[in-house]
UniProtKB/Swiss-Prot annotation:
Record's subcellular location: Secreted; Bacterial flagellum
Pfam families: Flagellin_C (PF00700), Flagellin_IN (PF07196), Flagellin_N (PF00669)
PANTHER family in the record: FLAGELLIN (PTHR42792:SF2)
Induction behaviour: Translation is inhibited by translational regulator CsrA (at protein level).
NCBIfam families in UniProt: PRK08411.1, PRK13589.1
Major localisation: secreted
Subunit structure: Heteromer of FlaA and FlaB. Interacts with FliW. Interacts with FliS.
Gene this chain is encoded by: flaA
Superkingdom of the organism of origin: Bacteria
Name this protein carries in UniProt: Flagellin A
Length: 576
């Protein structure tokens, strides 16, 4: 190796190595002081990109968890409010059940209805005031609300909370057939009871025998109510057109084949002979007699079999010739508010044939609060004739007098009850029946309007497949103020409870979904943060070793550089 003065190669090498080591020492000190392995893109370009992506994902997941907790807060608020509404509905149903017995007077039923009205007001108040951050929850406007619960857009959970006002819940379907006057074997099928399948019931005989009639059919329907969702009730009742007048039955007078014989009775059945004679055989006939508040004879089938009068019960009874065979009205109830679609054979025997007038209506909880309209009342199975209503007869006569004079009416000359007999039966008849003798009176009686498809000249004079309100039915008083109304309110309240339970079940399902999602993304967030830490954070043990190495090299480099510089002094010895 030659001796040179101008260029100290050894010193230059020592400096270069010291510079490199200084950079390593600076990087090591930076990592140890920041705790990060990557402090700039130069440290690890690809690693920094990955770490930044993971950090963004973790932060977004953190906000998604917060969003999910907000969703849970909303759902829990709605759930607790609906829990209180369910308690209110339970109370309403209990009060309706309390009213559904004839031990209650109109006064006490009215008091119960007042309680129910207040409860409904509070139910609606809860529905209209329950909110979260200014958003109404139970008014029906909280539909398809989305909550972002993922790191990427459109990773959402949707929530819908149904309306819980009294006008929106409890919608119950009521359908009641026309009065049946024919017997026979009935085959009944409920179409699409579950949206897909049909349900066929066993055939039932409609007659006056024990174990037959609408009572037997209702029992058959109710056996499968849990499956079909359809329940049935019946009303087999024959009511006189006017108050009982003095009269006599014939020797062969019989009800449901059981001979009762000749009976003389007074006005209003003052001596009780007619009613007591009928009731003496009620265990055999299944028919019980009574008087209503207007003094009219009422024959009621206890078990739903038909009521058939043979012989002559007497015109004074108020029972007209075409009332002597009666198989009643069948009422069907469905708790989901949808149409009850039926088919079958001989449906006219239950008042639901193709030419029968079937009353139908869907009634909400709120509608049971006030006066029940005639449409709803008839669909619920209230008696079509009650006090101020009228029986409707189609006759080829134009007046009550002509009806009384017609052969077979029981009011013809010589009967003792004819026009001008002094018994004023024409007045009672005019109050109790309406004669339909022309298209005009048909339209007036049934309130058939133009455009309805049933106006004069439409060709639908037989009212084929007509479903509407029975003629001349009357409005009924509110809710539980009548026995029948109390029964209907029980059905409606039960439907309302089912509706709320379904809404709460949906809320519960969404709560479980959100909770599971929060649990999942919480674990994901932890794992993502761990992955980011592996890339971005410094390993202090490893970096401390690197620092020690660089520090020692820095010291040794300084020594080496000093030695390299001092080696040039050796050249001076050559010049001595």
């Amino acid at each position: 190796m030659g001796f040179r003065i101008n260029t100290n190669v050894a010193a230059l090498n020592a400096k270069a190595n010291s510079d490199l080591n200084a950079k390593s020492l600076d990087a090591s000190l930076s990592r140890l002081s920041s705790g990060l392995r990557i402090n700039s893109a130069a440290d690890d370009a690809s690693g920094m990109a990955i770490a930044d992506s993971l950090r963004s994902q973790a932060n977004t997941l953190g906000q998604a968890i917060s969003n999910g907790n907000d969703a849970l807060g909303i759902l829990q608020t709605a759930d607790k409010a609906m829990d209180e509404q369910l308690k209110i509905l339970d109370t309403i149903k209990t009060k309706a059940t309390q009213a559904a017995q004839d031990g209650q007077s109109l006064k006490t039923r009215t008091m119960l209805q007042a309680d129910i009205n207040k409860l409904m007001e509070e139910l609606d108040n809860i529905a209209n005031t329950t909110s979260f951050n200014g958003k109404q929850l139970l008014s029906g406007n909280f539909t398809n609300q989305e909550f972002q619960i993922g790191a990427s857009s459109n990773q959402t959970v949707k929530a819908t909370i149904g309306a819980t006002q009294s006008s929106k819940i409890g919608v119950t379907r009521f359908e009641t057939g026309a009065q049946s006057f024919t017997s026979g074997v009935v085959g009944l099928t409920i179409k699409n009871y579950n949206g897909i399948e049909d349900f066929k019931f066993d055939n039932v005989v409609i007659s006056t025998s024990v174990g037959t009639g609408l009572g037997a059919l209702a029992e058959e329907i109710n056996k499968s109510a849990d499956k079909t969702g359809v329940r049935a009730t019946y009303d087999v009742k024959t009511t006189g057109v006017y108050a009982i007048k003095e009269g006599t039955t014939s020797q062969d007078f019989a009800i449901n084949g059981v001979t009762i014989g000749k009976i003389e009775y007074k006005d209003g059945d003052g001596n009780g002979s007619l009613i007591s004679a009928i009731n003496a055989v009620k265990d055999t006939t299944g028919v019980q007699a009574s008087k209503d508040e207007n003094g009219k004879l009422v024959l009621t089938s206890a078990d739903g079999r038909g009521i058939k009068i043979t012989g002559d019960i007497g015109v004074g009874s108020g029972i007209l010739a075409n009332q002597k065979e009666n198989y009643g009205r069948l009422s069907l109830v469905k708790n989901d508010g949808r149409d009850i679609n039926i088919s079958g054979t001989n449906l006219s025997a239950i008042g639901m044939g193709t030419t029968d007038m079937i009353s139908q209506s869907s009634v909400s909880l709120r509608e049971s609060k006030g006066q029940i309209s005639a449409t709803n009342a008839d669909a619920m199975g209230f008696n079509s004739y009650k006090g101020g209503g009228k029986f409707v007869f189609t006759q080829n006569v134009s007046s009550i007098s002509a009806f009384m004079s017609a052969q077979g009416s029981g009011f013809s000359r010589g009967s003792g009850f004819s026009v001008g007999s002094g018994k004023n039966l024409s007045v009672g008849l005019s109050q109790g029946i309406q004669i339909i003798s022309s298209a005009a009176s048909m339209s007036n009686t049934y309130v058939v309007s133009a455009g309805s498809g049933f106006s004069s000249g439409s060709g639908n004079s037989q009212f084929a497949a007509l479903k509407t309100t029975a003629a001349n039915t009357t409005d009924e008083t509110a809710g539980v103020t009548t026995l029948k109304g109390a029964m209907a309110v029980m059905d409606i309240a039960e439907t309302a409870i089912t509706n709320l339970d379904q809404i709460r079940a949906d809320i519960g399902s969404i709560q479980n979904q959100v909770t599971s999602t929060i649990n999942n993304i919480t674990v994901t967030q932890v794992n993502v943060k761990a992955a980011e830490s592996q890339i971005r954070d410094v390993d202090f043990a490893s970096e401390s070793a690197n620092y020690s190495k660089a520090n020692i090299l820095a010291q040794s480099g300084s020594y080496a550089m000093a030695q390299a510089n001092s080696s040039q002094q050796n050249v001076l010895r050559l010049l001595q």
